[in-house]
Amino acid sequence: MNLIFLGPPGAGKGTQAKRVSEKYGIPQISTGDMLREAVAKGTELGKKAKEYMDKGELVPDEVVIGIVKERLQQPDCEKGFILDGFPRTLAQAEALDEMLKELNKKIDAVINVVVPEEEVVKRITYRRTCRNCGAVYHLIYAPPKEDNKCDKCGGELYQRDDDKEETVRERYRVYKQNTEPLIDYYRKKGILYDVDGTKDIEGVWKEIEAILEKIKS
């Protein structure tokens, strides 16, 4: 079973992809991890990627696709894989299809975790992180016992720049702009499944599980 997970920042797609990975025994592959691994191993493509990353630039699609291809040829991907955070653009989706064709594979389902902008803003802007130990809290869903104080180490809690409202709205806008064409692309192929990401973790999982069981049978 070869899957792609789409969803805006804060949609909880990483959490769900991890559960799918555990239940079905297929690896969850995040582009970030893959790039870091290739750089650490010093592969040809890893060296190329490092040049761009060191300059703070985006790694070009052909390098990313090459790294994805190397990863998908590893033995743990034989039964399937979950791509998390890739593809991000239509060009990447088309390049991915071409590359999968060469490997005699195809995508079976694209799970699109749908969460409206205001919900994303609420989820992310209420996050607080401990300056000392890095523990993460949520002022609504998982608040600290004492205001502004970490339960674990007593450190001060703060809001990361990434979690500030204008940053979150900008990330959401960029996500929508890049992903809308992707969603159309996979919908036309008949493999896109929308999941209501506003439900609790268990509710979202039940929806995803039902889709995957249907695909498997």
UniProtKB/Swiss-Prot annotation:
Its EC number is 2.7.4.3. PROSITE patterns: ADENYLATE_KINASE (PS00113). Pathway: Purine metabolism; AMP biosynthesis via salvage pathway; AMP from ADP: step 1/1. It is found in: Cytoplasm. Keywords: ATP-binding, Cytoplasm, Kinase, Metal-binding, Nucleotide biosynthesis, Nucleotide-binding, Transferase, Zinc. The keyword rRNA processing does not apply. It catalyses: AMP + ATP = 2 ADP. AMP binds at residues 31, 36, 57-59, 85-88, 92, 160, 171. SUPFAM superfamilies: P-loop containing nucleoside triphosphate hydrolases (SSF52540). GO terms for molecular function: adenylate kinase activity; ATP binding; zinc ion binding. Pfam families: ADK, ADK_lid. Residues 126-163 are annotated as: LID. ATP binds at residues 10-15, 127, 136-137, 199. Zn(2+) binds at residues 130, 133, 150, 153. GO terms for cellular component: cytoplasm. The keyword Metal-binding applies. Catalyzes the reversible transfer of the terminal phosphate group between ATP and AMP. Plays an important role in cellular energy homeostasis and in adenine nucleotide metabolism. Monomer. Consists of three domains, a large central CORE domain and two small peripheral domains, NMPbind and LID, which undergo movements during catalysis. The LID domain closes over the site of phosphoryl transfer upon ATP binding. Assembling and dissambling the active center during each catalytic cycle provides an effective means to prevent ATP hydrolysis. Some bacteria have evolved a zinc-coordinating structure that stabilizes the LID domain. Belongs to the adenylate kinase family. This is Adenylate kinase. It comes from Archaeoglobus fulgidus (strain ATCC 49558 / DSM 4304 / JCM 9628 / NBRC 100126 / VC-16). The lineage of its organism: Archaea, Methanobacteriati, Methanobacteriota, Archaeoglobi, Archaeoglobales. The gene is adk.
